[in-house]
Regions:
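A conserved ligand/cofactor-binding region detector
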Residues: 1-532
Length: 532
């Protein structure tokens, strides 16, 4: 696996060394920095085109003192001894939930980002295709466009990826030009905000051209227990890229929180755990094959994007009883009896009173809303899936990315005159996928597929999490792909539980007549001007 190694001057290396566990590998931990600075670094990361260490030098280093010589970056000997006595002596896993670390993973493919983001109890910040252009080269070596490379994939793979990125690079200025003509700057729009919104529009329209091999940077903050589970899943994963990053994350965390990860390398602990994960995956694959479910049939695709409510659990009386439960002094059975005796009008008034006045979408009713549950099967483009997969407090399961479910060309790409190029990219992508799959590289073949290809996944979530997801993802500043999913989820919940749908007062169904990102960019511009 090839990845870029950034060059730093001697002075830059001296400034970086106290704060990063290494200066020449794509995975590293942050040390000797205030927690607020680590968080700010990761927050800025998503819109910064370069690496985290370069970001630190350009925007943070001048405002931070240089640590004193000999400052201890790791956990310290005494802490390690205490932890070993408690954790290994008493088996108290909860101790590993109370200490964490910030780790950056750079030059990771869009296939691997989904594996890295799978643990629920962690925080992630990923470089965004909405703010970063993918038309420039990586540092040399290896140079070239930003995609995952592996000699085992063959030279035909690199030729196909180069062609995809070439199409993207040539289309980008054309789509920007179309957007500027289609959405001229209004008098109340600052020029800088309008320019950023134009770029975001073009990036949004063309992100479906980018292959899943496209490289990104990601920041992770997690507790030791979450890192242990993440590393074991990576080491058990069939992709060499995942295994390599699992080892690198372990190496860096051993410099910062080694005691939390002491079980990973023990054959009778982490070794057996990883073997179990591998055996579990292989058993599922064998079962699918035995049942004749390992190949898509004619009924499975290509198909349009879709949202299907497979099933739901609970009724609105369950919701009212649960929302009242914490305030009453009786059994739930008595609460249900009282609720059942209410007429429809009184029931609606009670629910509105319990939900409260939600003047902000972040104001959500209490945990009683979790009494109802929904399971959705969704077919959407991989780009939309990437955004929806980031939600943590739900169950998400997804199938392998293949070309079987098809892909569409965005209407506005057609209007910009790039539709034929887009279709050619999809065909190149599909052909390379099939070539790799025919060589027995079915798992790695997903690298070749454009993000515009559709994937099937399931979201299983309660009504409270559904409210958070739908209201956030329905916003007019969001990408049209996941907005459509959020709107349809809301419609289907409203059909079975009208009262729940009515509680979601911040679902945005309006179309922004200007650029989707312009309002957010104008707010950012105003904040920057106020702080200047």
């Amino acid at each position: 696996m090839d990845y870029p190694v950034e060059n730093f001057t001697d002075a830059e290396r001296e400034r970086l060394r106290p704060h990063f566990t290494n200066l020449d590998r794509p995975v590293f931990a942050l040390v000797n920095l205030p927690e607020t600075v680590k968080a700010a670094l990761f927050a800025r990361y998503s819109r910064y085109p370069g690496t985290l260490r370069r970001l630190f030098l350009e925007e943070f280093a001048d405002d931070l003192p240089v640590p004193a010589a000999g400052a201890e970056a790791g956990e310290g000997k005494r802490a390690a001894q205490l932890y070993e006595r408690i954790f290994l002596g008493y088996g108290d896993d909860s101790v590993a939930q109370l200490g964490g670390a910030h780790v950056a993973c750079e030059w990771v493919s869009n296939v691997l980002t989904k594996v890295l983001q799978r643990p629920r109890l962690a925080a992630y910040l990923e470089q965004s295709t909405r703010y970063i252009a993918y038309d420039g080269p990586m540092p040399d070596p290896p140079g070239g466009y930003r995609y995952y490379r592996d000699a085992s994939l063959g030279p035909a793979y690199e030729r196909a990826m180069d062609e995809l990125f070439g199409i993207y690079s040539r289309a980008l200025p054309r789509v920007c030009g179309w957007a500027e003509r289609e959405f001229p700057r209004a008098e109340d729009e600052p020029a800088a905000a309008h320019t950023r919104a134009i770029k975001a529009k073009a990036f949004d329209l063309l992100r479906g051209l980018l292959p899943a091999s496209s490289l990104s940077h990601m920041g992770i903050f997690a507790a030791g227990q979450s890192y242990e589970q993440l590393i074991l899943h990576l080491l058990a994963h069939p992709l060499p890229e995942a295994q390599a990053y699992g080892h690198m994350i372990l190496d860096e965390l051993k410099q910062v929180i080694p005691s939390f990860l002491i079980r990973v390398e023990r054959p009778e602990r982490g070794g057996q755990w990883a073997s179990y994960l591998q055996a579990r995956r292989q058993a599922a694959e064998r079962s699918a094959m035995r049942l004749g479910l390992d190949d898509a049939d004619a009924a499975d695709g290509p198909t349009a994007a879709s949202v299907t409510l497979l099933r739901f659990e609970g009724e609105e009386d369950d919701l009212l009883a649960a929302m009242l439960f914490e305030a009453v002094a009786t059994s739930e059975e008595r609460v249900r009896e009282a609720v059942a005796a209410l007429n429809d009008e009184t029931r609606a008034e009670l629910l509105a009173e319990l939900a409260g006045e939600r003047t902000n979408r972040r104001y959500r009713p209490g945990r009683g809303l979790e009494a109802l549950r929904y399971r959705f099967e969704i077919v959407a483009d991989y780009g939309a899936f990437r955004d929806l997969q980031r939600h943590r407090m739900l169950t998400i399961q997804w199938q392998s990315l293949t070309p079987d479910l098809g892909a569409d060309v965005p209407e506005q790409v057609e209007l910009a005159g790039c539709g034929d190029d887009y279709r050619r990219a999809l065909e190149i992508s599909r052909e390379e996928y099939e070539r790799l799959a025919d060589r027995g590289l079915a798992t790695a073949a997903a690298y070749a597929l454009c993000l515009g290809y559709r994937i099937r996944f399931v979201l299983d979530l309660n009504a409270r999490e559904a409210m958070q997801l739908i209201e956030l993802r329905s916003g007019r500043e969001g990408h049209p792909s996941y907005r459509a999913v959020a709107h349809e989820m809301h419609a289907q919940i409203s059909a079975v539980h009208p009262a729940v749908g009515a509680l979601m007062t911040h679902v945005d169904r309006e179309a922004e007549p200007r650029l989707e990102r312009i309002l957010a960019e104008m707010r950012s511009h105003a904040r920057a001007a106020a702080g200047a």
